[in-house]
Design a protein with these regions (language model features):
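Acidic, Ser/Thr/Pro
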Residues: 1-288
């Protein structure tokens, strides 16, 4: 973090440099926007095809065909979930939280998309409903459904705790779920686990030090975050050991609850919709 007492004095024009107005890195005016009216209309008459209950401090995989919908639902009590997404037939194409953040901001809500990694960079899923959209940003700068945290993991925990071995961090939970789904050894599956969408987690950055903070999630039973799959998806969801993340994670101390994944089949895809195609960049990189 930035020092309270810098070692180097500001130059004479320092205040002028700091006063330069910022610009948005990735203006999204030219980005194709989802037709939310068509997406939501496609839900009429849908059928619930699959339910997957994710136990506390565990993770489970689920599949969603392109054009179908899925919800992550709070069922028994406030609970945060860590979500990984993959192309169903290619573990190498996975959610890219950094680019999603650059395009849509630190926290996602209705109309935002989860984008896949390079060289694919295409929409994987679109948020179609968010029952916590009322929360906005609070007085601390916190909001829900962030793409700034990475996921709790046993490596960071071991460093911070003097070597404690905890096996139910979200990273480990997701590793086990991916390993079981694909029949991979844990060390091979782990390489595919990636930075997450922190579903229901309330987070931000402190204004004085710029540190990542968490606070009690406002989620309550019945709340959900809903998506439409833009491609055939494999999802992996961990019910975080931090519970509502009001105090700590990476231990068994917090009260934890299950999360429910529901997968819905619409009668027909949204009008005018087609699955995400390949990114239009030719991948030549200027190399002869």
């Amino acid at each position: 973090m930035k020092p309270d007492h810098p070692e180097h004095p500001a130059p004479p024009d320092g205040p002028a440099r700091k006063a330069v107005a910022p610009v948005i890195c990735y203006p999204v005016d030219g980005l194709p926007r989802p037709d939310l009216v068509a997406y939501r209309s496609a839900r009429d008459g849908w059928t619930l095809e699959t339910e997957v209950l994710v136990p506390p401090r565990e993770a489970r995989c689920f599949t969603v065909p392109a054009g179908w919908f899925f919800r992550i639902v709070s069922v028994d009590g406030p609970q945060v979930g860590d979500l990984n997404l993959f192309a169903a037939d290619n573990l190498g194409e996975r959610f890219f939280s950094g680019k999603t953040r650059a395009l849509h901001g630190t926290h996602l809500s209705t109309g935002d998309r989860m984008w896949s990694c390079l060289p694919y960079l295409r929409p994987m899923a679109t948020v179609t409903e968010d029952t916590l959209d009322w929360y906005g940003f609070d007085a601390f700068g916190g909001s829900v459904h962030d793409v700034i945290g990475t996921r709790c993991d046993p490596y960071t925990h071991a460093l911070l705790s003097g070597g404690d071995q905890y096996h139910h961090c979200c990273h480990s939970n997701l590793t086990r779920a991916v390993a079981d789904h694909w029949g991979l050894p844990a060390k091979a599956a782990e390489l595919h686990v990636h930075d997450v969408l922190n579903v229901f987690m309330c987070t931000g950055f402190t204004r004085d030090t710029g540190q990542y903070f968490m606070k009690a999630s406002p989620v309550r039973p019945g709340d959900y975050l809903e998506f439409m799959a833009e491609i055939d998806l494999l999802g992996a969801l961990s019910a975080c050991p931090g519970g509502d993340c009001s105090a700590e994670h990476s231990s068994d101390l917090a009260a934890c609850h299950p999360l429910l994944v529901q997968v819905f089949k619409p009668p027909a895809p949204p009008v005018g919709w087609a699955p995400s195609g390949p990114n239009p960049y030719d991948r030549s990189h200027g190399h002869e």
